[in-house]
């Protein structure tokens, strides 16, 4: 058995889970998420917990077993607590502005970037150098944060760019000139 897959998922009182064929529907106070499940994986709701089992013991099915258990766990956590990622913009003249559903980023280039935030994810700004990405779908939150970070990744000499709050940038020593 998969070490992750065999663990049951406790369902909080505020969450409702339905299994209809190959679809798992999770509804909570923050919203609703739907996940399609492979035929080789069985999902049951029993005694206030979700149990994920597999039909076969081949290598691929074993991998899917742990994957779908983690996906369902993240869905339950998302509709109760939600997920968030924080980004920091570092550099002289680097800043971000929000207008409606779009972010406008000045990142040292001659033009500013416009990033349209997709549905299901909200973005909050703290000043003009901090970005907080929030939502109920862990994948979407991580994807949006990664797309914003990819606009200007932090460089190792001065640390200019967009980085996650918990990310540590390995700094390099610059060239030292020849002294006579």
Curated annotation (Swiss-Prot):
rRNA-binding: is it a keyword of this entry? yes
Report the PROSITE patterns cross-referenced here: RIBOSOMAL_L6_1
Q: Give this protein's Gene Ontology molecular function annotations.
A: rRNA binding; structural constituent of ribosome
Q: Which GO terms describe its cellular component?
A: cytosolic large ribosomal subunit
User: Per its UniProt record, what InterPro entries does this chain match?
Assistant: Ribosomal_uL6-like, Ribosomal_uL6-like_a/b-dom_sf, Ribosomal_uL6_a/b-dom, Ribosomal_uL6_bac-type, Ribosomal_uL6_CS
Q: Which domain of life is it from?
A: Bacteria
GO BP terms: namely:
cytoplasmic translation
The alphabetized UniProt keywords are: Ribonucleoprotein, Ribosomal protein, RNA-binding, rRNA-binding
> What Gene3D superfamilies does this protein map onto?
Ribosomal protein L6, alpha-beta domain
Q: Does the keyword Ribonucleoprotein apply?
A: yes
Share what the entry says about its subunit structure, partners included: Part of the 50S ribosomal subunit.
Its family? Belongs to the universal ribosomal protein uL6 family.
Annotated function: This protein binds to the 23S rRNA, and is important in its secondary structure. It is located near the subunit interface in the base of the L7/L12 stalk, and near the tRNA binding site of the peptidyltransferase center.
Under HAMAP family, the record lists:
Ribosomal_uL6_B
State what protein this is by name. Large ribosomal subunit protein uL6
Gene source species: Borrelia garinii subsp. bavariensis (strain ATCC BAA-2496 / DSM 23469 / PBi) (Borreliella bavariensis)
